[in-house]
Amino acid sequence: QWDFFDLPEQWTINYKNLTFNLKPFSFKHTGLFPEQATNWDWFSEKIKNANRPVKVLNLFAYTGGATLAALEAGAMVTHVDASKGMVTWAKENAVSSNLADRPHYDAIIMDPPSYGRGPKGETWKIEENIFPFIELCTNILSDDPLFFLINSYTTGLQPAVLSYMINTAIVKKFGGHVTAEEIGLNVTSNGLVLPCGASGRWEN
């Protein structure tokens, strides 16, 4: 059963020290994927415990949840998204979280769409492009990388597939180890977990 209610045009929520500006969209997004908090906590600890400056590249970065978490942990972050509106929104979130003045790759985070088009009509199909893209990304990792994180909402990219790709592209080059698992949100009313895709993590 669905409960419907009126939403404000825009509102803010907080997660730890981060503040996010949310607004409803016709395509069912609000500007935040809260299930990603488990990944934010994971890489924030790695950044804080690195005991060195950490440069992070966040690809398909949307409104900047992972960007803000990495900034707040002390990293320097380059935020990349094809949508100019999403980049503007990410900047607004950075201002709200008092992180706008931090300097803009020991780590890469990516949240690729299943399908997309670039500003010049380029086509992105995750089944065809994701593995070559991961391989290209290994060329811009530092000599001593800290972590690599891939999120997937695509049915065909299950944890085992993510693990295989990361092992093939990254472990053979840098060593380290890989974990991959489904992620979800706890449903408080019945104790079940709402599936929200999968994540693959590499760490040194």
Task: Report the location of each language-model feature.
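Non-catalytic substrate-recognition/targeting regions of SAM-dependent transferases
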Residues: 1-32, 41
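Conserved alpha-helix/loop element of class I SAM-dependent methyltransferases that forms part
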Residues: 34-52
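Conserved class I S-adenosyl-L-methionine
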Residues: 51-62
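Conserved SAM-binding loop of SAM-dependent methyltransferases across substrates and taxa
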Residues: 63-75
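Conserved SAM-binding motif I beta-strand of class I
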Residues: 76-81
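S-adenosyl-L-methionine
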Residues: 83-109
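S-adenosylmethionine
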Residues: 102-171
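C-terminal catalytic and target-recognition region of SAM-dependent MTase-like enzymes
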Residues: 145-204
